[in-house]
């Protein structure tokens, strides 16, 4: 039996309403393609393209993810994978997919990436092998970006297997949340109440 899993990775530092909207969109987007068995959230440990200086411990990030996804209609489909957190050194998508394939040998993976990541995708470690291990779908948050993405894929024939998903944008970022907390400002409009309470209770992001 083939198991269909969608993979959504990120720092989630912290998880916010934009992430939740996107998770719901990803779940709904897979329904016409036969649905999915699991939606794997993969928190990163030490992403190769970012500084880990302001990354809080994984235990806090995972706890906030669990609190945040409880209210989603697809909550029963969501699974948090610690596979990258358990690896040493930099986290690469290729190695993560190889490990996931070992865990789920019958798995068929759909990897979601941002449109900004797509334009740098050919710089990713073993990107061509990533395309062999998973169906890659690039998320564009604005309809106007779709043509730019389509043109990019047309010019780059080696990325022909990548498809595009348009998702309604929710303007919020983890950086914005961390800055607000550090300045003593409210974040109730950016994250679920349970996450805001957790951040306050644990004294996170206060600088």
Question: What do the PLM-derived regions correspond to, one by one?
Answer:
Residues 4-207:
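Nucleotidyltransferase catalytic core that binds NTPs
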């Amino acid at each position: 039996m083939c198991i269909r899993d969608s993979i959504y990775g990120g720092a989630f530092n912290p998880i916010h309403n934009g992430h939740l909207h996107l998770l719901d969109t990803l779940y709904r987007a897979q329904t016409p393609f036969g649905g999915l068995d699991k939606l794997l959230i993969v928190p990163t440990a030490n992403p190769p393209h970012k500084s880990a200086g302001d990354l809080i411990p994984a235990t806090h990030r995972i706890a906030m993810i669990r609190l945040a996804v409880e209210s989603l209609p697809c909550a029963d489909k969501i699974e948090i994978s610690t596979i990258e957190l358990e690896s040493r050194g930099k986290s690469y998508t290729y190695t993560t997919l190889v490990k996931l394939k070992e865990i789920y040998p019958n798995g068929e993976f759909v990897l979601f990436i941002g449109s900004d990541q797509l334009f740098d995708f050919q710089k990713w470690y073993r990107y061509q092998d990533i395309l062999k291990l998973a169906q890659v779908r690039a998320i564009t948050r604005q309809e106007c970006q779709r043509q730019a993405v389509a043109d990019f894929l047309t010019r780059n024939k080696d990325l022909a297997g990548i498809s595009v998903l348009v998702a309604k944008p929710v303007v919020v970022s983890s950086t914005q949340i961390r800055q607000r907390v550090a300045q003593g400002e409210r974040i109730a409009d950016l994250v679920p109440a349970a996450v805001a309470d957790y951040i306050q209770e644990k004294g996170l992001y206060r600088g």
